[in-house]
């Protein structure tokens, strides 16, 4: 199906630059069938609400046919919708409805690996001489029967699993049921490019590409070196996971990834489609972001992990991150997020007050780059407390209780307080329980409260959308004064001065020189007075001056 959309909607090839993207985790957004699991028809129902937030696009996490061992990130058919979520016709309705509301659609493509139930893998493991025998990463055991090297899986244990049929190991960077595709095989690359074209022809406007730095591996299968203790962190894997003990020099970040990304960009170009690549690396994430987004032949943007940090970011931390982006990716483009389907929701993670949550929201909309917001974030949802017996996430089950997994950020969206399921589903039991603590923050109640965070999100998004300087302008070097973050964004016709107090204290700053005006008092922006700019705790200041 080719969905026709207006020229004005589709013409701009740079629509992604500075875009606000709303992430939907479909299992948890809206159930239309009564089975306790969200679906595509549910998304269609809620698209008017999404459009009302002022976002540019939605990103839908995987909905493809899957055994759901990793909740859709283990694909068994790239060209169909899992019956749990509906049909291809339902997906076409998502495209049509989103476009009718001026919202673009990005889908989450998982190309580094498939499910072990994919026909490709079933054929590949059957013998060493079939047409797809080289489509996955197979290797002989060492003489003592142990795996070919020391590579580790993010989900724990060796990254190699024994297959008695082939009498070889296969590589899996994630679950044993998620075998890695062999990108050194040209036929694999072409098959995946054909998948991309299938969805582009169906009307999608772009892709969120899962784990793009895992596509290629070292063909010699050399051991990863030990990572010095002082360089280890839990950016990508929880601290209890020994995955953090290696420098993943050979298992990912292969330079030949760039060759495939060029091919992918060429496929997307005629459609004016855009891709945001997820780069998961605990030591070199921003450097890889720069490598993968520099110029106009690779990724349009990369999803950055630095603001998904466990510790609440200080002004100095944010300045250091942005300085490094300018240093290693000055010609690239980052996509920022505070929350997603893999991390503890940021109001809980950072222990934010209401004022701090509002200020971080405003700050996000002023940063250079594109922005992803995660469903329920606009309601101020805290992380849900999910009992062990209700856990679904294999990651959490494996490392419980030191790491409780990702279910706490994946509980169903709350639309109203009328029943225990918050308007998400009519089922007696939902796939994850709805958090009772979330019911009082439902969309219906938040809409009725003019002081709720949802209205602040709308205003902050509207600020970004109404100023090209904030969407796609340049950014001055950032500075820090008494815990305040200060920078200026500039476009062709205006400059916007941004100051954010990331402390619990009142701070007095010097007023910037020039004819500056407060541009949005609804965001609690401070105004200059008596030659000073007095910022209360967790208060922003957004000023504008015209250049023409």
Features from the language model and the residues they span:
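Generic enzyme active-site microenvironment
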Residues: 106-107, 208, 276, 337-338, ...
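Surface-exposed beta-strand/loop patches in extracellular or lumenal glycoproteins
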Residues: 502-514
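Solvent-exposed beta-hairpin/edge-strand motifs
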Residues: 512-523
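Loop/helix patches that line or flank the sugar-binding groove of alpha-linked glycan CAZymes
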Residues: 2, 15-18, 220, 224-253, ...
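C-terminal beta-strand-rich structural cap/linker in extracellular carbohydrate-active enzymes
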Residues: 529-548
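Hydrophobic residues within beta-strands of alpha/beta enzymes
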Residues: 58, 207-209
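Acidic/aromatic-lined carbohydrate-recognition and catalytic surfaces
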Residues: 2-197, 201, 214-283, 413, ...
């Amino acid at each position: 199906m080719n969905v026709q959309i207006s020229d004005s909607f589709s013409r701009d090839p740079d629509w992604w630059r500075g875009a606000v993207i709303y992430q939907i985790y479909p299992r948890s957004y809206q159930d239309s069938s009564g089975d306790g699991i969200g679906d595509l028809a549910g998304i269609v129902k809620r698209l008017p609400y999404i459009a009302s937030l002022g976002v540019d696009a939605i990103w839908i996490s995987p909905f493809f046919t899957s055994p759901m061992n990793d909740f859709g990130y283990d694909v068994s058919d790239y060209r169909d919708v899992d019956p749990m979520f509906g049909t291809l016709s339902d997906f076409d309705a998502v495209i049509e409805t989103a476009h009718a509301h001026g919202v673009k659609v990005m889908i989450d493509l998982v190309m580094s690996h498939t499910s072990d139930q994919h026909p490709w893998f079933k054929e590949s493991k059957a013998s060493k001489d079939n047409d797809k025998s080289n489509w996955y990463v197979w290797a002989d055991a060492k003489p003592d029967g142990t795996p070919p090297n020391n590579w580790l899986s993010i989900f724990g244990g060796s990254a190699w699993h024994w297959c008695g049929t082939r009498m070889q190991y296969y590589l899996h960077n994630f679950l044993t049921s998620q075998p890695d595709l062999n990108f050194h095989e040209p036929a694999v690359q072409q098959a995946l490019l054909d998948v991309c074209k299938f969805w582009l022809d169906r009307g999608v406007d772009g892709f969120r590409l899962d784990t793009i730095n895992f596509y290629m591996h070292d063909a010699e299968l050399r051991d990863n070196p030990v990572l010095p203790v002082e360089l280890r962190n839990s950016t990508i894997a929880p601290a209890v996971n020994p995955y953090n003990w290696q420098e993943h020099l050979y298992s990912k970040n292969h330079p030949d990834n760039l060759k495939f990304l060029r091919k992918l960009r060429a496929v997307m170009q005629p459609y004016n489609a855009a891709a945001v690549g997820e780069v998961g690396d605990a030591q070199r994430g921003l450097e890889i972001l720069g490598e993968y987004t520099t110029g106009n032949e690779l990724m349009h943007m990369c999803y950055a992990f630095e603001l998904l940090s466990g510790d609440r970011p200080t002004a100095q931390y944010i300045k250091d991150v942005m300085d490094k982006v300018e240093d290693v990716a000055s010609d690239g483009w980052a996509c920022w997020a505070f929350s997603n389907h893999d991390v503890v929701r940021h109001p809980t993670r950072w222990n934010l007050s209401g004022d701090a949550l509002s200020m971080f929201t405003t700050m996000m909309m002023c940063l250079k780059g594109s922005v992803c917001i995660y469903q329920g974030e606009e309601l101020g949802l805290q992380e849900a407390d999910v009992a062990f017996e209700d856990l679904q996430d294999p990651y959490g089950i494996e490392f419980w209780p030191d790491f409780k997994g990702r279910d706490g950020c994946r509980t169903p969206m709350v639309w109203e307080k009328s029943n225990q399921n918050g308007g998400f589903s009519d089922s007696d039991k939902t796939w994850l329980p709805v958090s009772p603590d979330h019911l009082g923050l439902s969309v219906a109640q938040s809409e009725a409260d003019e002081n709720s965070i949802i209205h602040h999100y709308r205003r902050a998004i509207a600020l970004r959308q109404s100023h090209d300087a904030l969407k796609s302008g340049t950014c001055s070097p950032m500075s820090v004064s008494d815990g305040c973050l200060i920078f200026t964004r500039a476009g062709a016709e205006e400059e916007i001065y941004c100051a954010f107090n990331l402390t619990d204290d009142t701070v007095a700053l010097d007023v910037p020189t020039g004819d500056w005006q407060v541009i949005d008092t609804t965001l609690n922006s401070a105004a200059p007075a008596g030659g000073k700019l007095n910022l209360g705790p967790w208060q922003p200041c957004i000023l504008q001056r015209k250049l023409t």
